[in-house]
C-alpha cells in the first residue's frame, strides 16, 4: 500500500464519528407511552368511580333521610295535613312523593315472611268462608269470620274491600265501610274496586258527617240558651270539671279514682297509697284548666307562647324543668317517629300559622279542634305531656266556639290511640268522628243534668270498678238524691234513648 493510501486510510479513521448507544426499536417508544397513559387512565377511572360511589351513597342516604323525614309528617289524606306541615318546598315534596308512592306500591307486591304468608293464606281462607256464610244468610257467623280475616291480614286490600262491602250491604254501616275502602285505596292506589267503592260511598259519608255536625250545633245552642245563673248548670260544670281531669290523666295511666281526684282538687290533701307524680299530674291539669278559663278562651289568636305556657302548667308539678320547653332529644311513640328536635321550631311556627289562619278558623269547630289536637300530638314537641296539652288545646278551641270542654273517657283509651294511628296512616276522619262522638256525649251530660227529663242517658262518670265508692254524681234538676247518672259504656250512642 502506497503512502497516499495509508494517509487516506488514517484520515478516514480519524474522521469516523463516535459510536452512539443503540437506539431502541421504534415500536418500543409508543409502548412505554401507552403504558404510562394507561396508568393515568386507570387512576382517573378509579378516582372517578370512587367519587361516583361516594356521591351515590351520599345521595341515597340523603334521599332516604329526607324520606324518613317525610314519614314524620302526616301523609296526604282527607284534610291534607301533610301539605300544611311540609318542611320542604312543593318541588321537593313532588319529587319525594314519587319515591313515597313507589315504596307503597313495592311494599304491597313485596315478598312476605313465612309467618306473614301463613297469616295471609289463613285470612283469605277465612274470607272465602265468610262470604259463603253471608250468601247463606248467616250474617253473625260471617261477621266473626270477616273480623278474624281482618285480624290476620289488616292491610290486605282484598280483605279490607270484602269486609267493607259486607258492612255496607249487610250491616248498613256505610261510614265504617268507606273507612275500609279508603284504607284499601291508600295501600293500593290503582285498585279499581277500591276506587269504584269509594266513588259510591264518599259523598254519602260526607253528607252524614255534615249532618252530624249540624246536630252538635243544635245541642250546643240548646245548652247556650240555659242562663248562667242556673244552679243545675253550675253543678254540671263543676262535676264535668272533675271528670275532665280524672279522664284525661287516666288516659295517660293515672290510677286515681274519680272520688280521689275530686278529693285532691277540693282539699289539696294527699291520698294514701298513691304516688307523688299521680297527685302532681292532677294538680298540673288543674293549673292548666284555670289558665285556659282565665286567659286563652278570651284570646283571638293562640300562639306558640300560649301552648308553651299551657304545657308549663301541665308539667309544673311533675317536671318543672321540662315544662314549657321543647324537647331536645328524639322520641319514639309506638310505631310513630315524631320529627327530630331540630325541626320543632319550624313545625311549630307553621302550626301556629295554620291555627290562626282564616281557612282553619272557617272550619266547623269540632273539625278544627280535632285537627289541631292531631297536628300537635303528631309533632310531639315535648318530652312528656303531649297528649294532655293537645287535649287542652282542643278544648280551648271548642270553648271559644261555645262548646263545653269535651271529655274523652279513659275507658276508650284504646279507641283513642287507634284512631290517632289511623290518622297517621292517612285517614283522619275516624279520629274527627271520635271527637264528635265524645262532644255529643259531653253535651248530653250537660243537657240531661240541666233538664227536667225523668229518665237517664249514658254518661261519662266512672269505670265499673269504681261503682259503689260513694262518688257524688250529677243529678237532674228534678231528681232526688237517689237518682244519678249511670256509667258510660263505650258502645253508647250518646243520643237520648
UniProtKB/Swiss-Prot annotation:
SUPFAM superfamilies: Fic-like, TPR-like
Entry annotation: catalytic residues: 380
Fido domain sequence ranges: 302-437
Gene3D superfamilies listed in its UniProt record: Fido-like domain, Tetratricopeptide repeat domain
Summary of subunit composition and partner proteins: Homodimer.
Residue numbers marked as site, Important for autoinhibition of adenylyltransferase activity: 252
Protein residues bound to ATP: 252, 333-336, 384-391, 416-417, 424
Stated role: Protein that can both mediate the addition of adenosine 5'-monophosphate (AMP) to specific residues of target proteins (AMPylation), and the removal of the same modification from target proteins (de-AMPylation), depending on the context. The side chain of Glu-252 determines which of the two opposing activities (AMPylase or de-AMPylase) will take place. Acts as a key regulator of the unfolded protein response (UPR) by mediating AMPylation or de-AMPylation of Hsc70-3/BiP.
GO cellular component, one term: membrane
InterPro entries: Fido (IPR003812), Fido-like_dom_sf (IPR036597), Fido_containing (IPR040198), TPR-like_helical_dom_sf (IPR011990)
Cellular location(s): Membrane
A GO biological process held by the record: protein adenylylation
E.C. number: 2.7.7.108, 3.1.4.-
GO molecular function, one term: ATP binding
TPR repeat residue numbers: 123-156, 157-191
Similarity field: Belongs to the fic family.
Protein name according to UniProt: Protein adenylyltransferase Fic
Domain notes for this protein: The fido domain mediates the adenylyltransferase activity.
Reactions mediated catalytically: L-tyrosyl-[protein] + ATP = O-(5'-adenylyl)-L-tyrosyl-[protein] + diphosphate; L-threonyl-[protein] + ATP = 3-O-(5'-adenylyl)-L-threonyl-[protein] + diphosphate; 3-O-(5'-adenylyl)-L-threonyl-[protein] + H2O = L-threonyl-[protein] + AMP + H(+)
Region annotated Disordered, chain positions: 1-30, 468-497
Membrane topology: Single-pass membrane protein
Chain span(s) of sequence motif Inhibitory (S/T)XXXE(G/N) motif: 248-253
Activity regulation info: The side chain of Glu-252 determines which of the two opposing activities (AMPylase or de-AMPylase) will take place. In response to endoplasmic reticulum stress, mediates de-AMPylase activity. Adenylyltransferase activity is inhibited by the inhibitory helix present at the N-terminus: Glu-252 binds ATP and competes with ATP-binding at Arg-391, thereby preventing adenylyltransferase activity. In unstressed cells, disengagement of Glu-252 promotes adenylyltransferase activity.
Membrane-traversing stretches: 38-58
Amino acid at each position: 500500500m502506497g503512502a497516499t493510501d495509508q494517509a487516506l486510510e488514517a484520515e478516514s479513521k480519524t474522521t469516523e464519528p463516535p459510536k452512539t448507544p443503540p437506539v431502541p426499536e421504534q415500536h418500543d417508544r409508543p409502548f412505554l407511552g401507552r403504558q404510562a397513559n394507561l396508568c393515568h387512565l386507570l387512576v382517573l377511572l378509579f378516582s372517578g368511580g370512587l367519587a361516583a360511589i361516594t356521591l351515590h351513597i351520599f345521595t341515597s342516604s340523603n334521599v332516604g333521610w329526607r324520606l324518613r323525614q317525610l314519614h314524620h309528617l302526616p301523609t296526604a289524606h282527607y284534610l291534607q295535613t301533610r301539605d300544611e306541615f311540609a318542611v320542604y318546598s312543593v318541588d321537593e315534596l313532588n319529587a319525594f312523593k314519587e319515591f313515597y308512592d313507589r315504596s307503597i306500591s313495592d311494599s304491597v307486591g313485596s315478598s312476605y315472611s313465612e309467618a306473614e304468608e301463613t297469616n295471609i293464606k289463613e285470612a283469605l281462607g277465612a274470607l272465602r268462608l265468610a262470604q259463603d256464610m253471608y250468601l247463606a244468610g248467616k250474617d253473625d257467623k260471617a261477621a266473626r269470620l270477616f273480623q278474624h280475616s281482618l285480624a290476620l291480614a289488616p292491610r290486605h286490600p282484598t280483605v279490607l274491600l270484602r269486609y267493607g262491602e259486607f258492612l255496607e250491604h249487610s250491616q248498613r254501616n256505610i261510614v265504617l265501610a268507606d273507612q275500609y275502602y279508603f284504607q284499601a285505596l291508600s295501600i293500593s292506589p290503582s285498585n279499581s274496586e277500591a276506587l269504584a267503592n269509594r266513588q259510591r260511598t264518599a259523598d254519602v259519608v260526607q253528607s252524614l258527617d255534615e249532618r252530624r255536625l249540624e246536630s252538635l250545633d243544635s245541642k250546643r245552642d240548646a245548652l247556650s240558651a240555659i242562663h248562667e245563673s242556673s244552679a243545675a248548670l253550675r253543678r254540671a260544670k263543676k262535676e264535668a270539671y272533675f271528670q275532665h281531669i280524672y279522664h284525661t290523666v287516666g288516659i295517660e295511666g293515672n290510677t286515681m279514682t274519680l272520688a280521689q281526684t275530686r278529693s285532691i282538687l277540693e282539699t289539696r290533701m294527699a291520698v294514701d297509697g298513691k304516688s307523688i307524680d299521680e297527685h302532681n299530674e292532677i294538680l298540673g291539669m288543674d293549673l292548666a284548666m284555670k289558665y285556659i278559663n282565665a286567659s286563652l278562651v278570651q284570646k283571638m289568636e293562640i300562639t306558640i307562647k300560649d301552648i308553651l305556657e299551657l304545657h308549663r302548667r301541665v308539667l309544673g308539678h311533675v317536671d318543672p324543668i321540662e315544662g314549657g320547653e321543647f324537647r331536645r332529644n328524639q322520641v319514639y311513640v309506638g310505631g310513630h317517629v315524631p320529627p327530630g328536635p331540630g325541626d320543632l321550631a319550624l313545625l311549630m311556627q307553621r302550626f301556629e300559622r295554620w291555627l290562626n289562619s282564616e281557612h282553619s278558623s272557617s272550619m266547623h269547630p269540632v273539625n278544627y279542634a280535632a285537627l289541631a289536637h292531631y297536628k300537635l300530638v303528631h309533632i310531639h314537641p315535648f318530652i312528656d305531656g303531649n297528649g294532655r296539652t293537645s287535649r287542652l288545646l282542643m278544648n280551648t278551641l271548642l270553648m271559644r266556639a261555645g262548646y263545653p270542654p269535651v271529655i274523652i273517657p279513659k275507658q276508650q283509651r284504646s279507641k283513642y290511640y287507634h284512631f290517632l294511628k289511623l290518622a297517621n296512616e292517612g285517614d283522619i276522619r275516624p279520629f274527627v268522628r271520635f271527637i264528635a262522638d265524645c262532644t255529643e256525649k259531653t253535651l248530653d251530660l250537660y243537657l240531661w243534668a240541666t233538664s227536667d227529663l225523668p229518665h237517664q242517658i249514658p254518661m261519662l262518670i266512672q269505670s265499673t270498678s269504681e261503682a259503689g265508692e260513694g262518688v257524688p254524681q250529677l243529678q237532674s234538676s228534678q231528681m232526688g238524691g237517689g237518682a244519678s247518672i249511670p256509667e258510660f259504656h263505650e258502645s253508647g250512642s250518646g243520643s237520648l234513648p
